[in-house]
Each structure stands twice: as structure tokens, then as C-alpha cells.
Amino acid sequence: MARSRANRAAESACGHWTTVPCFMCTNQCGLNVYVEDGKVTEIKGMKSHPRSKGGTCVKGRHIVDYMYHEKRLKYPMKKANGGWQRITWDEALDTIATKWQRAKEQYGPASCSVFLGEPACLTIETGWFMAWRLCDLFGTPSRFEPLDLCGTAMWMATLGTFGYLTEPDMENSGCIILWATNPHASDPIGGVLAIEAARKKGAKLIVIDPRRTPFARKADVHIKPNLGTDGYLALAMINVIISEQLYDKEFISKHTVGFDQLAQHARNFTLEEAERICGVPVADIRQAARLYATSHSGCIRHYFRPGFMPDGVHNYRSFAILAALTGNIDRPGGELTFGFAQFAPSTPVRLREKLGDAKWVGQDKFPLFSKYLSFFKDGSMTNFSDSILCEPQQVRNMILCGTNPAVSSNNTAKVKEALSKLDFLVSLDVVMTESNKLADIVLPSTVAFERLNFSTYHGEFIGRQLVEPYHEAKSEFTFWSELGRRMGYGEYFPWQTDVEAMDYFFAPHTVENLLKEHPDGYLNWNVLPGARRYEQNGFPTPSGKLELYSETFRQYGYDPLPTYRGPTVSRTKTPQVFEEYPLQLISGFMEVEYWHSMYHQVDVLRKRAPGMFAEIHPATAAQYGIRDGQPMVIETSTGSVETCARVTRDITPGMVAIPAGWEGNNLVTNDATMDPISGVPECTGLLCRVRPAAGHGKQDVVAVTGDQVMEMAGE
């Protein structure tokens, strides 16, 4: 909102500016926030921020609308007489503690579960600390969070290859591959600025995506593979780089293991077969491989979509090996070390010894998951519905904390059935969601500016509390701490404020001193400049080298080299299924206005992106009698959903694409097939069919044409 000159002159008397990180997504851009009369009233970009450089996306610009929206939850409520009844926090906490203790006595501690949500936007790590701690004390390993729909496969692959995580240095790169990602939606400030800066310096751009995204229009090479074939495409590129001897021979010789096995293996993935499987011309594959390998540096930006396949971990292993072959590791313009926390807790947050031999859900099925990710999480989300619906029932009580699985999880019909079967369901959230509607108790949560935050995602930062909580909202820290004390664990939760807890865990650092030393809240940038540290210290892997061939994978019964199996169903593998479902489905691409299922209540954002839709090519639409802006039905073997058709040439013929986060979009995805290494469900490359909807469809179908949507894009 604009401020008059008179108001600005009076700032020192009635308000002040503060520098904090944004919390509307995991990119965590820098913000200058104006606070007046106890409320946040204005948002500006922080020009000194190294990634966002003063920019803000549409979500960040409308934080005020989000914070003070009338649909925010104001006080605790319990379900009663078919509706909601206001209760006190004391009643809510006492009820939860009693229910959990009784379930523990009758069914054991594993019958009680927590499902932690989006770490960037609701349960920032301060809250996670307390949730982990309470679960350890209570003795339950039944805990879930949505990393399985984001980075599990990627993390397992990079940790298994490099020993650490990496981040592409796009701004300094000579060649950037955008693999199944659209930065204009997922990283619209820092990512877009970095790519544009590199392009101005002459960087080449390769986009691998069936959709024609903004950067695909500008790319030197745009590859549009069949869905689910990314792994074969990457292995074919590896074949080109090795067979044409375009790899960094010195790096491979000194710093890797398994090159000979990889070279032999890669010969199996020919360009001719890649053209047949991937639907990509041989010349395009060869051009992309040569361009990437011969540039002075190269990096690959990918997000979660390549993990949504039966070959998810292998796909990311192939991407990592492309970087390794070209020597683009820990050097400017390549894949930089994504360092872990410099300000790590000096006192352990976890109390694992209290768990004993308890196994988390899915531990036997996904043993390598436990090896690489047990520091971060303790359960496979893919199994969470099964842990409720199985006989005998394993999980009976659950606390949702900033998560909406009834919309965001695969096969939501099954998810809703599972949540409804629970003996007792609690949800801590900002607004009423589809998941909250199934709960017995709903609790109002703070948002980031209403509490202290600490995070290590894009750099370590402290986000100071700027204003008091909205109505009766409480922070995750307060909720878990007070619940722990009611359960009899008071000695483990002695802190009355989150600042006291942070001072304890991070001693000798204190929040006060850290903010004095770093007034903008940014303590350390995790992405370390390319310094080739492996030359002195090697790689943090069992061999001490970058592992092209993974002995660890072999010992766990998995292929030690990345391989390709392809989608569970496809035109070539299951022709009978393809005859019934002849189209490929892209499920869950991102929209810049939202973060998963969040912020749909914000009016300005809803005006720009009013509801769920399906992209379909004009040729495909004509084939099935579908018209732009009219209701259509998408069907898979799992279920069906009615939505609005957006006829566009920005998608490959024979494919249909729907965005993430809208109610109903996961009625057509399944949780029955998954990556056997990570447990990530298969939701890329599913087969579907389409038809026009009868009549005008449901009332919540938003009928807008592609041209109308483009007109709405400006504010």
C-alpha cells in the first residue's frame, strides 16, 4: 500500500522498518517489512539480499492480505453436534494429552502419530525441534512429513553419489539445464534473476519439459520427452559424453570410482532407442549432451518431478553423474556444495535413546531411506494411509501440523478414508482446510512474522517476531512444548519462550547476539563458493570419492549404477491399458501464486489464478470434443476429476497437465506404485483419458479461457 510523505515523516514515532526473510515459499527472499501500531502494513524487497536482490513475487507482495485475512483461524475449536464449538487452549491441550496417553496404554506409543507440514511456511525448524523431541519422549516412531512429495529421491541420490547435497550455480554457469522445472513458478525471483544474468553473459540454455514454459521459449534446445522417460534420456546423454570422450578425464581419474563399470553400462542406452522410448530426435539428444559437456561450466536445475517415477532415485543419480563426468562439482558455474548448518545445535534436539528399537513406518521396506535421511525424518509418507487402514490398525491418533494431505497427497480418496478412520485427529493450521474438516480438534497457528523462526534451507536465518499472534493463535513451539509438559515431560521442556529454547540449543550463541551481529537475520549462506574442497578432503562417501558405482546401493540390494525401468504403464509396456487410457498426465505443476495448497483464500491471488484447470493441446482437444474454457473430465485407473479446459499450444499433443494444490487434483493419482528405493509415489507419466463434462459441471469449476487467464496475469 502507498504511504504519504507525512506518514513517512512520522515513521520514527509510530512505526519502523525491519529486515526479515520471506516465508511464503522455501526460496526465502529478503524483505523489508514495515510495522505500525502492532501490525505489518507494508512489504518491500531487500535490495542487499544476494539472491532476490530487492525483488518480490506476487505471494510476497501480498503477505499482509494473507496475515490478516478474515478466513484465518482465530481460536481452538472442537467438533460437536455436526458443527464446530469454540473451546479454550487448556481444554484442547488437556484433551489431546489424555487421548494420547490412553492410546499409548491400550495400543502402544506407535499408535499415536504426527504429520508435520511445510517447513518454510508453517512449521519452521523451531517447531520441528519440539515435535521431534516430544515424539522421542513419547516413544512413537510414527511421524510423517511431505518431503516424499518433494526431495526424498533427490536427497538420497545426491547423498549416495557425492556424500553431500548440491545447489546449481546458475548465475555463473556456461550452460544451464532446466530439467522438468519452471523457475517462473517455483523460483520466480532468485532463480529467474540468476538465469537471466547468466544468459546476458552468453550462457546456453537447455530446457527439458513437455510444457512450453517461459524459459523454454528462449532456450537454445527445448526437449519434450514422453513422461516418465527422463532416466533413459539422461543415460543416453551419458552415453554420448563417454563415447565421444567429452568427459573430464583428470577429474574422473582422480576423484571418482566406478567409471569403467559406468562406461560399459552406458553403452546399453543408445540414441536410437532413446528416440523410440523418449520421443526425442537423436540429433536433439546429441546436441544437448555436447552443449552441456563442452561449455566452460554447466549445471542442472531440477526439482521434484523426476522423483515421481519408479526410477526416481536412479534419475537423480544420472543427473549427478552428468555433473561428475563434466567435472562440474564444487566449482563456479557448476554444482556447489550445499553445506549443512554452521549454527547447528550444540545440544541435541533429538532424544533418540528414548525410542529404543522402535521402527518408523516403512523402515523394513525402504532401508536405504533410513540410512540417508534418518537425520531429517522418520517415516515414509507413502505408507501413512496404509498404517491407518491396515489390519490390525497401526496408527489411531494423529496430529497434523501445517499440512493438508486430503488435498496434497496421492490418491486423496484413500487419504480421506484413512483420516476419517482415526480415533482422534487434531490439526494445527492457519485456515480451515479439507484435512481440518475431518479433525476432532482444530487449533489456530501463527504465521512467521508472529513468532521466532530459524531455518537452514536457503542459508541459515533467524526470522524475528515482528507482531503479536493473530487472535488466539499459538506457535508450533508453544503447542508442542505445552503438550509435552501436560504429558509429564516438563523437565525436557523447561523453556517458557522460543527464544529461551534457541539460546539453550545453540549455546554459546544467543538470539540477541546473533541478531546484533546479523541485523538482517541472515547468519550464513549454505551454498558455498566453488572451491574444489574434494582436492584436500575427498568426498564424504564410504570410498572417499565421488561414487559413480555405489557399493552401498549394491549392499542394500539396489542397482549400483543408475538404470531405467520406465513408467509402470505406457504405450509400449502395457498396450492394453494404453488403449483404454491413451493420454499422458502431468499432475501437479506449480503456479507462482500459490505454494502447494496454500494461499487460495487470498483474493488478489485467487483473481489471478482462480481455480483448477487442465492444459490440453488444440489437436488433442479437438480429438475428444473439448473446448477452451468448458468443463472436462479427466479419468485414470484410480479415479476422476472434473475441471476446466485450457486449450493451449504450450503443452505437447497427447498430454494433459493439471496444477498442484487444488482439491480434486489428486483423485486421479495413485499411491500403489512407487520408487522402490525412496518410496516416492509414481505420479508422473500416469495414463488418462478425457471427455467433455455433462452440462456445466460442478459449481466450483471455474470456466475461464486461456486468453482471459493471460489478461489476468498483470496486477
Q: Residue spans of the language-model regions?
A:
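Short beta-alpha connecting loops at secondary-structure transitions
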Residues: A219-P225, H458-H471
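N-terminal export/assembly segments and adjacent metallocofactor-ligating motifs
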Residues: M1-E244, E273, P281, C401, ...
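Active-site phosphate/pyrophosphate-binding segments
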Residues: M237, V257-M381
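N-terminal leader/propeptide and maturation segments of large enzyme subunits in energy/redox metabolism
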Residues: M77-W89, L246-V282, D364, V467-S543, ...
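Extended redox/cofactor-interaction regions of prokaryotic respiratory oxidoreductases
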Residues: T126-I208, F215, G231-L235, A324-K437, ...
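Catalytic, metal-anchored helix/loop core of enzyme active sites in primary metabolism
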Residues: D440
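Flexible, glycine/charged-enriched surface loops at secondary-structure junctions
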Residues: Y107-S111, Y247-I252, C299, D330-T337, ...
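Long, contiguous, secondary-structure-rich segments that constitute the structural scaffold
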Residues: E476-D520, Q601-E615, A619-E715
